């Protein structure tokens, strides 16, 4: 049987069945610090900090709360079925009166403008916007750490309580410090599950038995009540997507007026500008010849980094923003 699953909290290869996510989270939170553990003492696992958000709402932020929920461009947004599934789920949630948790920052970064076209054609854009999944651009965003800042009140609460807060994204990498420097647990999920967890606002939920929220009439709503069926998705796909959407968009993909307007000088090789502070000729290539000299014996060298397994370039030098209080920020 094929079961829905996620991956995390620190490596993309660490698969977790959706049905086991709640118990997995409880174990992960208090497990020793490692690939899946966060080292929180059991006595502190229920710790929470009161937050007064920028909109005036008051809530308690705690371990396991999802502060970033992002449908990202890299992995799933070339798959219309899951993208439309996320849109239909959003529509069904809005019809029930459900909202995204006030501490969760949702975003939508389609991998193609075609996604925007078929969302508009299917009438799903408004529902996604209603939940806060606004289109923030076409390209690499949250997965590489370009999610933008959290609300200052949330940022301060995380710092004060040393909270292990989470992100749920539809990206392909979730290494520590990559998505956001304050978010210690990051899980990869399908676009519909990103929407679902944004509404739930926490990993401390079993969707099979726990309500995802309360509707406008005060009745509990289960995820199954709003989850789109395959028939719903296929019906919307048949009505909203045409081959012309792809051919029209991709026929001009190599031409962009703003890019074409940048002045340039034709040349066989890139004309490095010595005064540039942004793009510079690496010193490694100075004096290089077609036939390099053989590597000589290395004596008296020191090891710069001696690392264990599963240490990536993202651990050494995260691609996203770095905190003002860190060494790089100073």
Residue ranges and their predicted role:
Residues 2-123, 261-330:
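Non-catalytic terminal/interface segments that mediate subunit docking, oligomerization
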Residues 17, 60, 67-72, 105-108, ...:
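Structured core elements
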